[in-house]
Amino acid sequence: MEVLLGVKIGCLLALLVLTLGCGLTPIYVKWFQMDAATGHHHRVLSLLGCTSAGVFLGAGLMHMTAEALEGIESEIQKFVEQNSTGSKGNSSRDAASSYVEYPYGELVISLGFFFVFLLESLALQCCHGAAGGSTVQEEEWGGTHAFGFHKHPAVPSPSRGPLRALVLLLSLSFHSVFEGLAVGLQATVAATIQLCVAVLAHKGLVVFSVGLRLGKIGTGPRWATFCILSLALMSPVGLALGLTVAGGASGQTQGLAQAVLEGIAAGTFLYVTFLEILPRELACPEAPLAKYSCVAAGFAFMALIALWA
């Protein structure tokens, strides 16, 4: 038991140190700063940004969405089994079967997606309502013609950047807490180390991409450092929570609430990935095949990590 506790404390420190290192590197190392880059250096950073977009895509689909769907399905199955115990007749079994087959996980993820959509729409309405509708329309459609065949496709509005960055950090924070919680709840040393290594690889890639993203949208060093520090603390906090409840039985309501929160976080993450990160990285038509390869490589990294996560 003492060995297991020591391993988990070591994992906690490793998560904190690695996350801080990976997140702060693209913020404070001048080589990663897009504003000062020219020529070949600028192209390399652009392709690196596409790779980070693939990492976000893989994290959203292969990790956050997959884990949310699995968790919600498992909790719904437990709920149906507990409520159908002792029931008689085929009608009750058929009703329970149809109850389980409903796509609750997809519904929760979609609710997270539409929640951020609504939040952003309200923010834009408040910001641009006094200026009239023409300003917003020109901002959104001024850079494109006839289904995007103009040479300068539209990119996401800069006014949306801070809000979407905040949504990205919040969704990642939720997910990081649950990742740390999973490590803290492991019952053996081998399982703890295996899961921690997978989380370290996943977290390192994602947080590096977050640091790169914060630098590209012009976030100040102090605010970017605060964001990375907050994100770095989430997995250790989750692991510490797992240590406190490891050995105690978790209630059904607690498990369902965790699964629902993971689903909402996955939906918000997918919204930011598809409507902010990918469009911004692919807006420039330069070297489209190279950008595709980098996005695919980033996704492949996360898909490979999913074998052990």
UniProtKB/Swiss-Prot annotation:
Induction notes from the record: Up-regulated upon the induction of differentiation in cultured keratinocytes.
Extracellular face of the membrane: 1-8, 65-103, 186-191, 247-258
Subcellular location(s) per record: Cell membrane
Signal peptide extent: none
Cytoplasmic side: 30-43, 125-164, 213-225, 280-288
Record's bilayer topology term: Multi-pass membrane protein
Site (described: Critical for the pH sensitivity): 63
Keywords: Cell membrane, Ion transport, Membrane, Metal-binding, Transmembrane, Transmembrane helix, Transport, Zinc, Zinc transport
Binding-site residues for Zn(2+), renumbered to this chain: 175, 179, 202, 276
Transmembrane parts of this sequence: 9-29, 44-64, 104-124, 165-185, 192-212, 226-246, 259-279, 289-309
UniProt keyword Membrane present: yes
Tissues where the protein occurs: High expression in the liver, skin and ovary.
Phenotypic consequence of gene deletion: Deficient mice do not reveal any specific phenotype, however these mice are more susceptible to abnormal embryonic development because of zinc deficiency during pregnancy.
InterPro entries: ZIP
Any one Pfam family match given in the protein's UniProt record, by short name: Zip
Function: Transporter for the divalent cation Zn(2+). Mediates the influx of Zn(2+) into cells from extracellular space. The Zn(2+) uniporter activity is independent of H(+)-driving force, but is modulated by extracellular pH and membrane potential. Transports also other divalent cations Zn(2+), Cd2(+), Cu2(+), Co2(+) in the order of decreasing affinity, respectively. In the skin, aids in the differentiation of keratinocytes in the epidermis.
Record's protein name: Zinc transporter ZIP2
Gene: Slc39a2
